[in-house]
Amino acid sequence: EEMGYIKITVEYPVLSNEELSDSLQKRYGLKKVFLVPKLSSTSIAVQEDVCRAAAKDLSSYLKDGSIIGTAWGRTMKSFANYISDLGVKNVKVVQLNGKTNLTSVPVGADDLSQAIARAGCGEAYVIPAPVAVDSAEIADMLKQERNISAALTLGRDCQIALFGIGNLSRNTILYHSGSLKEEDFVELEKKGAVGDVCTCFFNASGEAVSSSFSRRRISLTLEELKKIPCKIGVASGLEKKEALHGALLGGYIDILYADEELGKEILNY
């Protein structure tokens, strides 16, 4: 161990506060809520605990031939580390939004889709385009391109969607990659945006926020996302409070995995 050849990790059981989970489930009309106790003081460790719990349950939502849509981000990059054999085959995994504008920014898009595809003995499909382009006209043209159109169509056919909850912040991959420009951020902030799922922004009431960014975006829309039968949202950290609350009010989540502290804040919102 002292020479670095042995690494010891402690795998403790992840437990959920059932009473708090039940209260959240009833208040927001959710199918399931799993809240992970906060057993660490670091935000990364808490995020990993939540992702580990969600990844452990993923197989229970899948069957042979399932189509699952995913969106990239820091949470989903962490989620990919905990995927194991799903006990199903012929699973199709499709990205629900285009890629960031800078490939050097680690977002976990390919990591997650490939990990689920391998674990489900299936195939991964990506949207071969940036998440946002220079104009609405270019976005409209690209959405008609054969490969991009096919990926978006497959996304609309998903039985399951898996994603993290983004908050409107300059400390996000979307902003640091240049996909969300400063003028986009200012416009969204002025229009009351509080967060996003699959790079689709919404306000505190969960309503879609129309903006220059939304018109240049290449992804499913919030209305299309809502039609997916099983939407699994994964979130951790109190900074996600307002965004998660908006996502719940908007009906973008059916199954929620979060840390207990965040769950308490949402219940008392």
Across the structure, where does each feature detected by a protein language model lie?
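Gly/Ser/Thr-rich loops at beta-strand to alpha-helix junctions
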Residues: 68-78, 167-169, 237-239
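HTH-adjacent hinge/linker in prokaryotic transcriptional regulators
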Residues: 1-67, 81-89, 102-105
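Conserved beta-strand elements of the Class I
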Residues: 68-69, 94, 163, 232
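Conserved phosphate- and dinucleotide-binding cores of soluble alpha/beta proteins
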Residues: 1-10, 16, 99-269
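A broadly conserved amphipathic alpha-helix scaffold signal in soluble, globular proteins
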Residues: 59, 77, 81, 114-117, ...
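Short Gly/Thr/Asp-enriched flexible loops that form oxyanion-binding sites at enzyme active sites
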Residues: 75-89, 173-183
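Catalytic or ion-translocation cores adjacent to nucleophile or general acid/base/metal-coordination motifs
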Residues: 92-100
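Conserved beta-strand termini and adjacent loop/short-helix elements that scaffold enzyme active sites
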Residues: 36-38, 96, 127-129
